[in-house]
């Protein structure tokens, strides 16, 4: 709950979300603050300490999807000579775990650990569009900061965008977090239940033509990786 709240939570707000008393909520938060896992600001609002994000990144790097995705993504990076990334959503943030860059006809892996608001980047939108209603509502119900003129900063705009992403199967970012003139496209990696566990993306695309050219192979890679995680198996078993 703290992870999904960019503005933090007060004792009363946490008590309401946990359906418990204010005294219980207060004791819990006080214990977490004392242990250094939660920070309290001057307005007595509470936020997760940065070490939670560090632990989250470390845990995410052990996800099986990374081992499955790497060879497929390396292949498409070499073929199209365009950098790509693998990301997950934790709380309200998209955490970029790894990127692959073309290098002398090969693909070079680089470990990342930076975060971007999930609603303001292609991987985040791709994951949110295929997440549970509860996960989407946690983002939609929070204030959405406008980083650039392109940022989807209202509930209505973001809801429409996520529906579009879900229908077409991929997300596009045209400078919604940092407008440097380049584009990015991302597709979700789906588990056996059809929920997104990660996203892969092409970034640094310089024009609309490059964007449209690379979407089909990106979608194909997403489908291949998702199938490796069991997506579609339940349907095939029923039909078969």
Short names for language-model regions:
Residues 24, 51, 68, 157, ...:
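Charged catalytic carboxylate motif
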Residues 47-142:
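Amphipathic alpha-helical effector-binding/dimerization core
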Residues 154-228, 240:
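Extended hydrophobic
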Residues 147-148, 179:
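Intrinsically disordered, low-complexity polar/acidic regions
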Residues 42, 90, 192-193:
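Short, ordered coil/turn segments that flank beta-strands lining enzyme active or ligand-binding pockets
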Residues 1-66, 226-231:
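N-terminal helix-turn-helix
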Residues 234-240:
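Signal-transducing coiled-coil/dimerization helices and immediately adjacent hinge/linker segments
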Residues 3, 124, 128, 132, ...:
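Short amphipathic alpha-helical signal-transduction/dimerization elements
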């Amino acid at each position: 709950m703290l992870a999904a709240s960019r503005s933090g939570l007060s004792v009363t707000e946490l008590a309401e979300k946990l359906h418990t008393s204010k005294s219980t909520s207060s004791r819990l938060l006080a214990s977490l603050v004392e242990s250094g896992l939660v920070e309290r600001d001057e307005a007595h609002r509470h936020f997760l300490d940065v070490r939670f994000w560090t632990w989250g990144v470390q845990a995410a790097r052990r996800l099986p999807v990374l081992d499955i995705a790497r060879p497929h993504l390396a292949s498409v990076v070499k073929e199209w000579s365009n950098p790509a990334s693998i990301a997950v959503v934790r709380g309200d943030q998209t955490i970029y775990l790894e990127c692959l860059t073309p290098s002398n006809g090969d693909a070079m892996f680089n470990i990342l650990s930076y975060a971007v608001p999930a609603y303001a980047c292609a991987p985040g939108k791709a994951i949110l569009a295929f997440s549970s209603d509860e996960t989407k509502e946690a983002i939609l119900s929070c204030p959405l900061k406008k980083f650039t003129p392109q940022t989807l900063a209202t509930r209505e705009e973001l809801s429409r965008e996520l529906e579009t992403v879900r229908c077409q199967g991929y997300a596009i970012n045209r400078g919604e977090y940092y407008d440097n003139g380049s584009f990015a496209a991302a597709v979700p990696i789906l588990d056996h239940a059809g929920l997104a566990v990660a996203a892969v993306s092409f970034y640094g695309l310089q024009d609309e033509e490059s964007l449209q050219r690379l979407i089909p192979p990106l979608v194909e890679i997403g489908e291949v990786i998702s199938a490796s995680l069991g997506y579609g198996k339940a349907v095939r078993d029923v039909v078969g």
